[in-house]
From Swiss-Prot:
This is Auracyanin-B. It is a peripheral membrane protein. The keyword Iron does not apply. It comes from Chloroflexus aurantiacus (strain ATCC 29366 / DSM 635 / J-10-fl). Belongs to the multicopper oxidase family. It comes from the Bacteria. Residues 1-56 form the signal peptide. One of its GO terms (molecular function) is oxidoreductase activity. Probably a soluble electron acceptor for the integral membrane protein electron transfer alternative complex III (ACIII). Residues 111-235 form the Plastocyanin-like domain. Residues 1-27, 64-107 are annotated as: Disordered. Its cofactor is Cu cation. Residues 57-80 form a propeptide.
Length: 235
């Protein structure tokens, strides 16, 4: 055997003898290896998609059919409620009517009659003093004959100016009854109705215990203007 070389090397590349490189195919004339790898990957991807679709069809990804809901049972209609009963309310205190009144007023035959008149041209009584016996039924006639065209009344109070002022204030708050004292006004013993100019009115009452008492007019401003008088009750 001779190791002598001839003028060229006997070593040949594997690729040249096989007709292609590793990335060109397995043998000469065959498809490139990269193409074969792409085809294999595509086939695998297709198989994966088919498997996923099969699982979805089998129920893995199929949307569940909604279950029918139970029909709600009809509820009973609410029982009719009765309207709340009206609570009794306390009636407001009745205002005094424009009429005679007072704690000493009586419905008896008078034993004595007395007349008082309004001054014709002033806010005053023509008679500024009276005298009557105690515990006597008296009818007082009041004549409002004046030239001023104003209203007047006659009110007997159980005391002096301090008591008269309180009675007068109560009457001022009773405009709906033309400023006569309201019923049960403390210390208002007797009064006539409020009279227009030219009218007359009367009140029957029992005289109080012996002493000195004021009588006034309770039309607004008249008592403060000095329209008052004194009743002296004798034993």
């Amino acid at each position: 055997m001779s190791w002598r070389g001839s003028g060229r090397s006997n070593f040949r590349s594997r690729s040249s003898s096989n007709g292609g490189s590793t990335f060109s195919g397995g043998s000469a004339g065959g498809p490139p290896l990269i193409v074969m790898m792409g085809l294999a990957f595509g086939a695998g991807l297709i198989m994966l998609i088919v498997m996923i679709a099969s699982n979805a069809t089998a129920g893995g990804f199929v949307a569940a059919t909604p279950r029918p809901t139970a029909t709600p049972r009809p509820t009973a209609a609410p029982a009719p409620t009765q309207p709340p009963a009206a609570q009794p309310t306390t009636a407001p205190a009745t205002q005094a009517a424009n009429a005679p009144g007072g704690s000493n007023v009586v419905n008896e035959t008078p034993a004595q009659t007395v007349e008082v008149r309004a001054a014709p041209d002033a806010l005053a009584f023509a008679q500024t003093s009276l005298s009557l016996p105690a515990n006597t039924v008296v009818r007082l006639d009041f004549v409002n004959q004046n030239n001023l065209g104003v209203q007047h009344n006659w009110v007997l109070v159980n005391g002096g100016d301090d008591v008269a002022a309180a009675v007068n204030t109560a009457a001022q708050n009773n405009a709906d009854a033309l400023f006569v004292p309201p019923p049960d006004t403390p210390n208002a013993l007797a009064w006539t109705a409020m009279l227009n100019a030219g009218e007359s009115g009367s009140v029957t009452f029992r005289t109080p215990a012996p002493g000195t008492y004021l009588y006034i007019c309770t039309f607004p401003g008249h008592y403060l203007a000095g329209m008052k008088g004194t009743l002296t009750v004798t034993p």
